[in-house]
Structure formats: C-alpha cells, structure tokens
Amino acid sequence: MRWLAYLAGCLIVGVVAMQVYFFLQIAAWQVVNPSSTTFMRAERWRLCGFNFWSCPVQRQWVRYDEISRNIKRAVIASEDADFVNHPGYELDAMLDAWERNKQRGRIVRGGSTITQQLAKNLFLSSEQNYLRKGQELAITWMLELWLDKQRIFEIYLNSVEWGEGVFGVEAAAQHYFHTSASKLSVGQAARLAAALPAPKCFDKKQYCANVHVNFRVKASIIARRMGAATLPD
C-alpha cells in the first residue's frame, strides 16, 4: 500500500504545481501579453503536424483602445451580456447547463462566460468532462483575481479562434473583411460575433457537418442587441 500512498502524493504535488504555474502565469499577464494559447498550439499541430514550430497562424495583437467599439459590443451581446457585473461565472447559467447535461447523460452545454471561455482557450483542451470544467472554474477565479475586466476582454479578443488558423480580432478583420480591427462596422462586427460558437464552419463549409447555426440570422439578432451592451471601459 505504500506505493499507492506515494503515487497519491505525487499526484497531489503535480496538481498543486500546475495550479501555481497557472496562478503565476496569469499574474504576469497584467503587464505581458500571452504569446500563444493551448488552442493555437493545437491548431498548429492539426494543420502542420511535425512542422509545428514553423506553422503559421494568423494573429496580430492589438491594444484594447485600438479595437472598434462595434466588435466589443457585438461580442458582449453575443457571448456574455452581464460580463462587466458577474465574478467570472453565472451560477444560474451553470445550474441550467448542469440540468441539461444530466438529462443528456453527458456534457453538451457549458454555460460559459467570456472569462470561462478565455480560461479554456488559454490553458485547456476542448474536451468536455467535469474534471476539465472544475479546472476551468479555478482558472476563471485566478483570471478575475489578477486582471480587471478590460484586460480580460482585451486578451479574449486577441486570443479567441475566428476561423481555420485565424486567432484574434485583428486577424479576423483582415481575413474576412480586409480591414483593421479598429474599423469594423456594425454589420461586420455582428457577423464576426455570430461566428464565435463555430468559427471554423463560418470560415469553411467543410467544417459544418455537425454545426447547426444560421450565421446570418444570428448576426441580425446580435446587431439589434449591440446598443444595450455594456463595455468594460
């Protein structure tokens, strides 16, 4: 039994060390921009395999004040209307997701806020299970502890996936509309926000087999809601 205790101890030490790494990494992002994310690295590997390090993805960091208010409002309206007020998660949405997942017998809905989405994008995989969800909540707490809402939103807009190998709002603006993130119109912003649940499908039809989103209808709904969106300015 001694070896079981040893293995358990090693596991606990490993888990604690991982949390310390996440904690210190997020603290550094108060002043340093993340150079990459788990999703970016996974996409590089998917596209290029062993040529991972030389595989380009489209991404260019832009400061928060260089990003159009239209896309900020569109993303808030689409993804997390109460972003500026909640502590990183919404209990009602999580409980609703829990009930739906119990009915389906598996995780099909996450009830994720923008901060939770960022936690997943930065550090975790797209795998759906309760252990990963627990880690996501821990990272969400760390993000909200160290970073203010504007910084969280800035990192999110510069890191989120917007197509095949397309990450961040500047790359998305250039890729789809041949413009900069600072010049996105209301219509363009609404279309980009509509793409967020299924960015690869929005980019290329070959990824749409299991996607059931009418991007045009969703964009029109987002455009109508943008005026009520509250930004972390």
From Swiss-Prot:
Source species taxonomy: Bacteria, Pseudomonadati, Pseudomonadota, Betaproteobacteria, Burkholderiales
Gene Ontology CC annotation, any one: plasma membrane
Family: Belongs to the glycosyltransferase 51 family.
Record carries keyword Transmembrane helix: yes
Principal EC category: transferase
Pathway in which this enzyme or protein is active: Cell wall biogenesis; peptidoglycan biosynthesis
Name by which UniProt lists this protein: Biosynthetic peptidoglycan transglycosylase
Topology term for the membrane: Single-pass membrane protein
Residues spanning the membrane: 4-24
InterPro entries xrefs: Glyco_trans_51, Lysozyme-like_dom_sf, PBP_transglycosylase, Pep_trsgly
Gene name tied to this protein: mtgA
Reaction catalysis annotation: [GlcNAc-(1->4)-Mur2Ac(oyl-L-Ala-gamma-D-Glu-L-Lys-D-Ala-D-Ala)](n)-di-trans,octa-cis-undecaprenyl diphosphate + beta-D-GlcNAc-(1->4)-Mur2Ac(oyl-L-Ala-gamma-D-Glu-L-Lys-D-Ala-D-Ala)-di-trans,octa-cis-undecaprenyl diphosphate = [GlcNAc-(1->4)-Mur2Ac(oyl-L-Ala-gamma-D-Glu-L-Lys-D-Ala-D-Ala)](n+1)-di-trans,octa-cis-undecaprenyl diphosphate + di-trans,octa-cis-undecaprenyl diphosphate + H(+)
Keywords: Cell inner membrane, Cell membrane, Cell shape, Cell wall biogenesis/degradation, Glycosyltransferase, Membrane, Peptidoglycan synthesis, Transferase, Transmembrane, Transmembrane helix
Listed EC numbers: 2.4.99.28
PANTHER family cross-referenced by the UniProt entry: BIOSYNTHETIC PEPTIDOGLYCAN TRANSGLYCOSYLASE, MONOFUNCTIONAL BIOSYNTHETIC PEPTIDOGLYCAN TRANSGLYCOSYLASE
GO molecular function: pentosyltransferase activity; peptidoglycan glycosyltransferase activity
Function (record text): Peptidoglycan polymerase that catalyzes glycan chain elongation from lipid-linked precursors.
Location of this chain's protein in the cell: Cell inner membrane
Example GO biological process: cell wall organization
